[in-house]
Swiss-Prot record:
Active site: K37
Residues that hold Mg(2+) according to the record: T16, D49, E108
Role summary: Catalyzes a mechanistically unusual reaction, the ATP-dependent insertion of CO2 between the N7 and N8 nitrogen atoms of 7,8-diaminopelargonic acid (DAPA, also called 7,8-diammoniononanoate) to form a ureido ring.
Disulfide bonds: none
EC number: 6.3.3.3
Keyword ATP-binding (UniProt): yes
Organism: Corynebacterium kroppenstedtii (strain DSM 44385 / JCM 11950 / CIP 105744 / CCUG 35717)
Designated name of the protein: ATP-dependent dethiobiotin synthetase BioD
Cofactors, names only: Mg(2+)
Length: 230
């Protein structure tokens, strides 16, 4: 299987834009990226993270499996709406159905690694069920080291393979904390940084984003992603 879980250290750290950037790099190298959002909350049909990736990249291989009305953790939103919880095995099988030779399935989680998607399971559980490695998207400012280290530690304790970190938003003129964090993130987490997304990249034109996305990452990012996800 070629499935990679895109998770984060929390909400609004840049997972969607990072997912789009990884998809662009994969496509440039001849792979067919396919984006899956297991659960979207607080967005009507036709909107949300998967459509945002399509708008940003032009890649229309994107599916949202479940939607819940309020912008909360998926399990909480499902409970409050009296809607059935997504089942782990069902979601895993749906994701596997998108996998095929030459394709890399990017699964964008909701919030952080341990956010409840179903009643009793998280994105970490989904990664383990799929046997899929994860990429952790993190913030880069003050407080980011603790969040990144906690997320990587939680993943490794569960036996998950962490491919690396992506800084979800890096300013043109980073402050002192951000500059220090760029040096310290790989040290405290024991995990490579695969790249940094420029601040505001989610508002770029599709043409600019697709052209510049490969420059966000280390040169061998595609090899790392495809080698570990096979």
């Amino acid at each position: 299987m070629s499935i990679v879980i895109m998770t984060g250290t929390g909400t609004d750290v840049g997972k969607t834009v990072a997912t789009g950037a990884v998809a662009c790099v994969l496509q440039k190298e001849g792979y067919e990226p396919f984006i899956v959002k297991p659960a979207q909350t607080g967005e009507p049909e036709g909107e949300g993270d998967a459509p945002r990736v399509t708008a940003l990249t032009g890649i229309d291989n994107a599916e949202t499996l479940y939607r819940f009305p309020e912008p909360l953790a998926p399990a909480t939103s499902a409970r409050r709406a009296n809607m059935p919880y997504p089942e782990l095995t069902t979601v895993a099988e749906e994701i596997k159905s998108f996998d095929k030779p030459g394709r890399v399935v990017l699964v964008e989680g909701a919030g952080g690694l341990l956010v409840r998607i179903g009643q009793d399971w998280t994105i970490a559980d989904l990664a383990r069920e799929l046997g899929a490695p994860i990429i952790v998207v993190c913030s880069t400012g003050l407080g980011s080291l603790n969040e990144a280290e906690l997320t990587v530690e939680a993943a490794t304790r569960r036996g998950l393979t962490v491919l690396g970190l992506i800084g979800g938003s890096i300013p043109d003129s980073p402050d002192l904390a951000t500059r220090c964090n760029k040096e310290d993130l790989p040290v405290v987490t024991g995990t490579d940084v695969l790249g940094y997304i420029p601040e505001g990249a989610g508002g770029w034109s599709q043409q600019r984003f697709v052209q510049e996305a490969p420059g966000f990452f280390v040169p061998d990012v595609v090899g790392r992603v495809t080698r570990e996800s096979d």
